[in-house]
Amino acid sequence: MHKVNYMHKVSRKIVEYMEANSLNTLFVGKNVGWKDSINLGRTNNQNFVSIPYNMLIQMLEYKCKLAGINVVIVNEAYTSKCSFLDREKISKHDNYAGRRIKRGLFISNSGIMINADINGSLNIMHLGLEKQNVKLDVLEEILRPENKRFMLNPVRLC
């Protein structure tokens, strides 16, 4: 499938999901220059660097605007390193509260395990809410018992 066509389908699926679930704000993490000095090996570099992430963001912004959904672009630096569950300040530190214990699995300072991508996503959402001056204790909402199953096993949409 052609990349542009795939990006249209992915962005449409995200917007449809948001509309179906009455979600009105999309937080998108972005790091300027994040693919510039990547070194994953020749083949992986070619596959990874060719992903048109900026194109996806532009499509999301356009489709979300048509649907009345607010898009907030957030600098995602250190969102994967800092522990959302420990309410760690998202910035560079000498020592971090949590850590990755293996690929895809993050453990907080208090011993709670969470999917590493979920940890990063929650930190991006937290930064986005701060950017919008929203005072909301997202942690309390996320840790409600009915939401805990998503912390280790995220739902795949596409």
Which residues does each predicted region cover?
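Positively charged, helix-rich recognition surfaces that bind polyanionic ligands
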Residues: 1-158
